[in-house]
From Swiss-Prot:
UniProt-recorded name of the protein: Enhancer of polycomb homolog 2
Organism: Homo sapiens (Human)
Phosphoserine carried by residues: 538, 754
Compartments where found: Nucleus
Record InterPro entries: Enhancer_polycomb, Enhancer_polycomb-like_N, Enhancer_polycomb_C
Lineage: Eukaryota, Metazoa, Chordata, Craniata, Vertebrata
Compositionally biased spans, kind Low complexity: 600-613
Length: 807
């Protein structure tokens, strides 16, 4: 038993020894290998590498240490030898040199090319030598330069001419040969290269994986804590040391700065003492002269223990503001942290005078008071306490507050909106910023001072503003404003008048009601009231009031664009009409209907005339029947008035409306009366200024409930209304030839038809002598063109409505 195979163990007396019988006694070698053998050492390889051939041979060579040395094998890579191939390549003409190490002299010898010619190159060289002389070395240099200049992409012919300093014919011949040979060669280059790999384990081309160089080193000792936690602790320790070093460097720099500041302060004090500047006049003059040279004044701050701030320099810019911070009185003994005073803005910079120059100030005494670094005060950042004036600010937290250290420009008065406070700027932007006294029509009341502006969709928005005259303005009745006659007023919109604007809160005395009315009458106070355009001047004013590119929408007509005309005959009112094309189409349809009626009447008269000769008795009965089915004027009026029922203005209001006329207040036309215009969304004003259609509404005044009869004046094409006179003369109830339902939107709900109206409608429907008028008539087609549903007073009689003759 050798020492190498024996492992020493501590003897244990309590452990029983094994007892073997003679026939069961194992061999000594087997017993030693089982009990006392050294355990197999770990190979240090991965599991998939332990079965490799080279590793197993090395392990087996380690185990045969007791055998002869000849049987021990050191694993090495296999090497193959081919002597015949070697002798064929290298012939035995080798001569032993005199010395193996040959040192060439250090001279400028030409570098030998790495490219070696082969038999194919020699053939080309012999062919080229017939025309010109070229040496093999010269040919190798040319190929070598082309190879080294090319990587994956070959050089071009022009680049080859720059590389090779030879004849163009020679360069072209060699270049073409090199390109052809390079393409035929499947390798990366024509120059053979030795495989030189780094032995750091980065390449995996080694076939012997077991003997590769290990990039990751195995951890052999477990007692060192090189884990992540210890690494983080080391990083934290390094950061703390770096921070301590940085703090020491900053303290060192601060102390140097303080020492330099102390020396400079002593020099300034000595110079002032020699000059006799005990009051600081010369020092202030020097500061002012320096501030005039600078374009933007920058405050200079002394970084001492008291945090004293020098007064900032001032400039003479007309709209420039400088900020000045007062020196805080700090008590060093208690080390208090006082609140910094609020910065005050200086509107104008004044020149220093002997009266305003400071003689001795406590801050000047503390300016030269220094203390050591251990008494440095670190200013505590406190949240600003809201002051009473800030709490009372209407803007609240959004109020503008000046920041310390910032410079602001003074507001320019010529660009501010203070026309009401400054009389000189009262006329600036008067069309944009003026507010005038405003009166509304519905409801009729005075809303005070307001300003008009256009909102989304062309809607007019009133911006009201409160003044101290609001209690008086609420007492104004719009009828007072309507009583002013426009004929006796001379409207002047020049800027010479001192207008009272909406923001007249700052007026000294409150005006009375009579004074306000007198100001309105004399055009000293602007007054606005909405108006409705007349029919006679709507065409002329439409071109001037409408903006370029603005069109009249058929579905939305503003109240100002709907014409209103009152006539004195029969109480007939005319409201806004249809377009020119619709009017012409309607005229053609009416003419065609009249022709059809006349043709049918002539045919029936002929048939009646023939029947009168054969049946004289039947003639009288048929004549009486025809007369009974013909309605008179009063019956037609009563039947048509039962179709639509809506409230209309009273007679007193209509009379007042006719007698009042059109009034102007400050050049604005006032509406006449209190009647409301019927507003129809499916009717539009005519775009032609010369031709306009009208819609007639008959007002019946003798009944208990007023009624509106929609009809259309179509007596003849020559009775087209052009102005008020023509319209008044053209509107006659006896001229109405056709009555058809009109799509009129009435604000109030239509009442139910009376039984008498139903009977009259039934009789009219049973008349076979008069043709029916279907809903596809002219005015009904207008509603279909506007894509709106027909809203008739009598839905049940809409299909049976007939044209009636009025005698």
């Amino acid at each position: 038993m050798s020492k190498l195979s024996f492992r020493a163990r501590a003897l244990d007396a309590a452990k029983p020894l094994p007892i073997y019988r003679g026939k069961d006694m194992p061999d000594l070698n087997d017993c030693v290998s089982i009990n006392r053998a050294v355990p197999q050492m770990p190979t240090g390889m991965e599991k998939e590498e332990e079965s490799e051939h080279h590793l197993q041979r090395a392990i087996s060579a380690q185990q045969v240490f007791r055998e002869k040395k000849e049987s021990m094998v050191i694993p090495v890579p296999e090497a193959e030898s081919n002597v015949n191939y070697y002798n064929r390549l290298y012939k035995g003409e080798f001569k032993q040199p005199k010395q193996f190490i040959h040192i060439q002299p250090f001279n400028l010898d030409n570098e030998q090319p790495d490219y070696d010619m082969d038999s194919e190159d020699e053939t080309l060289l012999n062919r080229l030598n017939r025309k010109m002389e070229i040496k093999p070395l010269q040919f190798e240099i040319m190929i070598d330069r082309l190879e080294k200049a090319s990587s994956n992409q070959l050089v071009t012919l022009q680049e080859a001419k720059l590389l090779l300093n030879e004849d163009d014919y020679l360069i072209k011949a060699v270049y073409d040969y090199w390109v052809r040979k390079r393409k035929n060669c499947r390798g990366p280059s024509l120059i053979p290269q030795i495989k030189q790999e780094k032995r750091d384990g980065s390449t995996n081309n080694d076939p012997y994986v077991a003997f590769r160089r290990r990039t990751e080193k195995m951890q052999t000792r477990k007692n060192r804590k090189n884990d992540e936690a210890s690494y983080e602790k080391m990083l934290k320790l390094r950061r703390e040391f770096s921070r301590a070093i940085t703090i020491l460097e900053m303290i060192k720099r601060r102390e140097k700065t303080k020492r330099e500041l102390l020396h400079l302060t002593l020099e300034v004090v000595e110079k002032r003492y020699h000059l006799g500047d005990y009051g600081g006049e010369i020092l202030n003059e020097v500061k002012i002269s320096r501030s005039e040279k600078e374009l933007y004044a920058t405050p200079a701050t002394l970084h001492n223990g008291n945090h004293h701030k020098v007064q900032e320099c001032k400039t003479k810019h007309p709209h420039h503001l400088s900020l000045k911070e007062e020196a805080s009185d700090v008590v060093r003994q208690k080390k208090k942290y006082p609140k910094k005073p609020k910065a005050e803005a200086l509107i104008t910079s004044q020149q220093p005078t002997p009266e305003t120059l400071p003689v001795i100030n406590k801050s000047d005494i503390k300016q030269y008071d220094f203390h050591s670094s251990d008494e440095d005060e670190f200013p505590q950042v406190l949240s600003p306490v809201s002051e009473p004036e800030e709490e009372n600010d209407p803007d609240g937290p959004c109020a503008f507050r000046r920041r310390a250290g910032c410079q602001y420009y003074a507001p320019r008065l010529d660009q501010a909106n203070h026309s009401c406070e400054n009389s000189e700027l009262a006329d600036l932007d008067k069309l944009r910023y003026r507010h005038c006294l405003t009166t509304l029509t519905v409801p009729r009341r005075c809303i005070g001072f307001a300003r008009r502006r256009i909102g989304r969709g062309g809607r007019v928005i009133m911006d009201r503003i409160s003044t101290e005259h609001d209690p008086v303005l609420k007492q104004i009745d719009p009828e007072m404003l309507n009583s002013f006659s426009s004929s006796s007023q001379t409207i002047d919109f020049s800027s010479n008048f001192s207008r009272t604007n909406a923001s007249s809160k700052h007026c000294e005395n409150r005006l009375s009601l009579s004074e306000i009315l007198s100001n309105i009458r004399s055009c000293r106070l602007q007054c606005f009231q909405p108006r409705l355009l007349n029919l006679q001047d709507s065409d002329s004013e439409e071109c001037t009031s409408r903006k370029p590119g603005q069109t009249v929408n058929n579905k939305r007509v503003s109240a100002a664009s709907v014409a209103l005309l009152n006539t004195s005959k029969n109480g007939i009112s005319v409201t806004g009409g249809i377009t020119e094309e619709q009017f012409q189409t309607h005229q053609q349809q009416l003419v065609q209907m009249q022709r059809q009626q006349l043709a049918q009447l002539q045919q029936k008269q002929q048939s009646q005339h023939s029947s009168q000769q054969t049946h004289p008795k039947a003639q009288g009965s048929s004549t009486s029947d025809c007369m009974s089915k013909t309605l008179d004027s009063a019956s037609a009026h009563f039947a048509a008035s039962a179709v639509v029922s809506a409230p209309v203005p009273s007679r007193s209001e209509v009379a007042k409306e006719q007698n009042t006329g059109h009034n102007n207040i400050n050049g604005v036309v006032q509406p006449s009366g209190t009647s409301k215009t019927l507003y129809s969304t499916n009717m539009a004003l005519s775009s032609s200024p010369g031709i306009s259609a009208v819609q007639l509404v008959r007002t019946v005044g003798h009944t208990t409930t007023n009624h509106l009869i929609p009809a259309l004046c179509t007596s003849s094409p020559q009775t087209l209304p052009m102005n008020n006179s023509c319209l008044t003369n053209a509107v006659h109830l006896n001229n109405v030839s056709v009555v058809s339902p009109v799509n009129v939107h009435i604000n109030t709900r239509t009442s139910a038809p009376s039984p008498t109206a139903l009977k009259l409608a039934t009789v009219a429907a049973s008349m076979d002598r008069v043709p029916k008028v279907t809903p596809s008539s002219a005015i009904s087609s207008i509603a279909r063109e506007n894509h709106e549903p027909e809203r008739l007073g009598l839905n049940g009689i809409a299909e049976t409505t007939v044209a009636m003759e009025v005698t």
